[in-house]
Structures are given as C-alpha cells and as structure tokens.
Amino acid sequence: HTRGFSASRDELISNDLPSMDAATGEKYVGNSDDSWATRSGFFRVNYSFADRYLLEVNGRYDLSSKFPKDDRSVFSPSFSLGWKLSEESWFKQATNGFFDELKIRASYGSLANQALDNGWYAYLSNYGTGTLGYIMGGKQPQYVLPGGLVSNTVTWEKVTQWDLGLDFVILQNRLKGTFDYYQRKTTDMLGPGRILPNILGMSEPLENAADMVTRGWELALTWNDQLDNGLHYSVGFNLSDTRAEITKYDNPTKSLSSPYYEGQIVGDIWGYESSLFQSADEIASAPDQSKLDGGISKVPGDIRFMDIDGNGVVDYGENTVDKPGDMKIIGNNKARYRYGFNISADWKGFDLGIFFQGVGKRDLMLPYTFKWQYGSMWQVPTAVGNDYWREDNAGGWLPVARFNGSQALGQNQTRYLLDASYLRLKSLSFGYTLPVSLTKQWGIQKCRVYFTGENLLTFKHTPEGFDPELDDPYKYPQQKSLALGLNVVF
C-alpha cells in the first residue's frame, strides 16, 4: 500500500525563498493511493536415505489481487531427485574406484509470475484526466479520456521446467564437473495480444497471449592440483547455451509486424542483403528499391539492396514469414555459447587470479547513434563518423554522406549486422603476503600487498564506443580500473 502527495507552484520570486507562498504562478496539487495484496502458503519436504537417495518436494499456493477474482490463484509444485551412484558398492567395483563421486539428478517444477508492466490492475480500465492547453471562457478546460482496452481474463504467467543433471569428481578429487540439460516452458506469457486494426485507435490489451519453450545446457569443469614444489593451482571452465521458440501466439498470417509468430526463434533478425553502389553503371542496372530508400536519387556510395526473389523490385512483400519479399533471417541478437574460464594459483606467499568471460555467438544491429546519417553530430564516435564512403575511401563502412539517406540506413541489413561475440579479461589480481616470521616482529599478524585490474583487455568486433557485454548500447561502456592495495591485520 503506497500513498503519495505532491504540490508545486510556478514563478518563484527568489531561489532563496523556496516556499509556495513566495511564488506567483499556478498551483498544482496531486496525490496517489495504491494498494495490492498477495496471500501465500508453501511447504517443503526433504528426505535422504544413507546419503545415497535424495528427495525434495516443494509446493506453494498463491493469490494475487492484481488479477480478476476468478483468476487470482495458482499452485506451483516442484520436486527433485538425486542418486549418488558412487556410494553403491556394485558401482565402485564396476568402475574400479575411478569415480570419487558421481551423482545423477532430475528435477521438475513450476513457478508463477505476476509482474505487470502496465500497472497493478491490468484487468481494469482507467480514465485519464487533465487540463487542455488552450483557453475557453477565460480558463483552461478540463478533459476526461477513456482508458485503453483490457482483458478481463488476465492471470498468472507460468513457467514449468524439467532438468537432468550429472555431478562427478575423478582423479583423486582433482577434476570436478557438472552438466545440466533443461527445458523450460513458459505458458500464458503476459504481453500484447493479436494486432488490431489501426482504425480502432487503441493499442492491444495486455493478455496471456503466448507460449514459449526454452532449451539449454550448462557445463562446468574445475581442475585443482598441487605440485611437488608447493605450487597450488586451480583452472575452471564453464560453457552454456540456450534457445527459445514461440510455440503459441494468435498471429495466423505470421505477420512480421507482430511481436511474435508461432515457430519464431526469439531474437531472430529479419532484414535485407546489402552492399554499397560503387559506380553509376551499378545504379543504372539495379532493381527498384524505392520502397526501402524513399526513392532518393542515388549516387555511388549509397546503400544497395539485393533482389533476392528476382522480381525486379526490392521490397518486403506482404511482410509475413511465408511472403517476406526480399527479407530473410539475417541473424539473431540473443547471446549464445556464453563461456568463462579462471585461473588461480598461490606459491610461497605469491597469489594470482585471472578471470576471462565471453560470448561465442551474437548478432547485432547497432542503433542510430552509430549510424552517422541517423543521429546528430554529437552522438557519433569520431572513428565511426569519419569512416564513410568517398572517392578516396571506397572501402568506407558507412555510405556516402548525405542528408536524406536515413531511410535506407535504418533498414535491418547484412552490411551493418555486426558480430557481437567477444572475449574479455574481466579481472586480474596479483599479490604477495609477507612471511609471518617477519611480520610478527612488527606486531602484525598478516600483511599483503596486491594489484588488481578489471576489464583490462577486450577482444571484439564492434565499433569503438560500444561495449558488447552490455545489452543496451546506450549504456556507458564498462571502465577499465587499476588498483594497488595493502592489507594489514594486527
């Protein structure tokens, strides 16, 4: 339950008198009073027999005022099973003690989500009120607007997942590993429903509009060892991948204007094959692409779109999956093959830690900031803005400089589809701990000097100014940092 109150007044007489009575302009007063509630119950049961057979059962029941009365409840059960094969005598004999530990796991469960992006009561339509910006009868008239469309059957979004896993330890506890394969089904996804005709004059209501299936796997390996000279070291590696597919959505024509269609791989980028015109002869023999570039009078260096279907016109057809014209899937913006590896070591007081992380595959259409003609001069990194086509730079990345080329440049296309995979030295640390026999003479229990660094190296394919680790290109890139430190314990 939240309550809010606000009051303000224009035309303050003096900044030194921050009082509403010290102003002469209009007064504005507002308040808010919002509330919502949940009611929940849950249970958990754990069972272990001989530290060999493991069982856990969970369940919870939830009610939420965010949904209509008949759709407020949801029950979310889950269970997990584990079997330590390495504790079985017959398995030890069969493997001749090769496995120090081996466990197989299985789990199944569901969760529910009530997070709504458009307010606390998505099934209720609200009126909008305000003051018009013109004068009638000596004063500004008030107005009341009808609310948008709502669904009276909106309810919980549900996620159900099953998982199969394997944990193992071998080679005298030096090599440890885990592997998981999972499938997650999201049903009754909260989002906009089927696209409605523009003549309606309102946007689509929030509905339980779609189902999605996500499949993925995760692998992690760690090696620990100590050499005869006292050097202890550890090396770790992890790798994972996931893909999501829309399995239900009310879009019978599979329109590409809709947010989803059945069979869609989440993150797919539809676009055109493109290059740059290099001569007037290429322009004269090119198919009609006026639907994509606005019919501008083209010159060498302008964007050239490919006529994939060979009909002499470059366009988007009926803008559907089955009739996309010259469009096709040119990439996918979801990160795949996320990986990381770390190294740590210590020897005679010295310690070292290194951590790398990266993404093996990801495609990206950069936003307008990185396309010179589509943004202002203040938005574009110099290295990018200067690399445009001209006679002495026919290999320039951006097209020829012009004031009316934004429509062509704004199309999703292969020329400006970037490889957003990367490898980054995320952190590095190196330190030395002075011998205790020395520090005790100074009344110090421990003394360590160290150096640390973050984001020191990045191997990437994207233009300068864009950080491939960030999902939002407009966020400020992560900064490199260096530090020297001293830890003293008395």
Describe each PLM feature range.
Residues 25, 309-312, 395, 406, ...:
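Intrinsic-disorder/low-complexity loop/linker signature
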Residues 332-365:
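Glycine-rich, aromatic-lined ligand/substrate-binding cores of catalytic
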Residues 317-318, 355, 401:
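Short linear motifs in exposed loops
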Residues 324-325, 350, 409-414:
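Short, flexible active-site loops
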Residues 62, 163, 167, 180, ...:
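Acidic side chains
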Residues 207, 224-333, 373:
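Conserved small-residue
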Residues 64, 305, 359-448:
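Extracytoplasmic gating/loop element in the C-terminal half of outer-membrane beta-barrel translocons
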Residues 1-271, 408, 412-490:
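Extracellular/periplasmic, surface-exposed regions of secreted and cell-surface proteins
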